[in-house]
Amino acid sequence: MPLRIIFMGTPEFSVPTLLALAGAGHEIAAVYTQPPRPGGRRGLDLQKSPVHQAAERLDIPVLTPVNFKEAADRRTFRNFGADAAVVVAYGLLLPEEILSGTRCGCYNGHASLLPRWRGAAPIQRAIMAGDRETGMMVMKMDKGLDTGPVALARSVPIHATMTAGELHDRLSEVGAKLMTEAMARLEAGELPLTPQPQEGVVYAAKISKEETRIDFSRPAAEVHNHIRGLSPFPGAWFELDIAGRRERIKVLGSEISQGEGAPGQVLDGSLAIACGEGAVRLTRLQRAGGKALPAADFLRGTPIVASAGIG
């Protein structure tokens, strides 16, 4: 028989898994997602999460607790009588009472090959570190941070020009298929669980505002990885003097280039920038409040002369 599932997720990354599970015939008893957040131009409108909106389109009940500190919220969760909970980028810590609140437990779709990149930002960290491979894993959750036993895994290559946004979309697609397979195996009583290795643990800390600034004193390969690992969000950036004002410019695309100079020096008219070793060419940029533009279009509106310094 199809499983009775509670789905827990918030961003766009989670939506394909919700749709896949519903499409596979499982009964989605309820969807848990983070509460609506202020949005719009002035922050006056409350915006529902992508998962919230998807659940409403499917006529699935939606719950948005701020946390699970209230006994009533924990009791409501248990009273759904679910076979399992599926958690994909929910964004809230789950207490023991929730982890054990379904017949078979909680299963998390995590965007890395655990135990590498446990934590909040596995996609960005993998690219920023220059990894050539990552993947999706389904694990049974325990009280640790991404420490539970692994049920299924799929590896995904990270190509040299792939951005975090592109990898995000690929892993979201892979994760939906993998979780659907995991729930089918759980339904059949054939879902394996393997403890994670003790070696190779690396944590994917949340991206801080301070580290998004580009440090051109680093080698070109590291600068390139930094840029694509933060593209499109939150975006790596440098500062530039424009009409006497210091302005922050986001860089959403780059490639390794040739050339030497002082770190941050503009080497030519197509935005090759000297790094600590080698150079990177900036291929897509965005001014504050403006659109992301290819470098040639950006330069037509914002000239940056060769030999200038940026940072």
From Swiss-Prot:
Top EC class of this enzyme: transferase
This protein's name: Methionyl-tRNA formyltransferase
Pfam families, per database record: Formyl_trans_C, Formyl_trans_N
Record function comment: Attaches a formyl group to the free amino group of methionyl-tRNA(fMet). The formyl group appears to play a dual role in the initiator identity of N-formylmethionyl-tRNA by promoting its recognition by IF2 and preventing the misappropriation of this tRNA by the elongation apparatus.
This protein's GO CC annotations: cytosol
Residues reported to bind (6S)-5,6,7,8-tetrahydrofolate: S112, L113, L114, P115
HAMAP family: Formyl_trans
Keyword list, A-Z: Protein biosynthesis, Transferase
PROSITE patterns per record: GART
Entry-linked PANTHER family: METHIONYL-TRNA FORMYLTRANSFERASE (PTHR11138), METHIONYL-TRNA FORMYLTRANSFERASE, MITOCHONDRIAL (PTHR11138:SF5)
Natural source organism: Sinorhizobium medicae (strain WSM419) (Ensifer medicae)
Similarity comment text for this entry: Belongs to the Fmt family.
Catalytic activity: L-methionyl-tRNA(fMet) + (6R)-10-formyltetrahydrofolate = N-formyl-L-methionyl-tRNA(fMet) + (6S)-5,6,7,8-tetrahydrofolate + H(+)
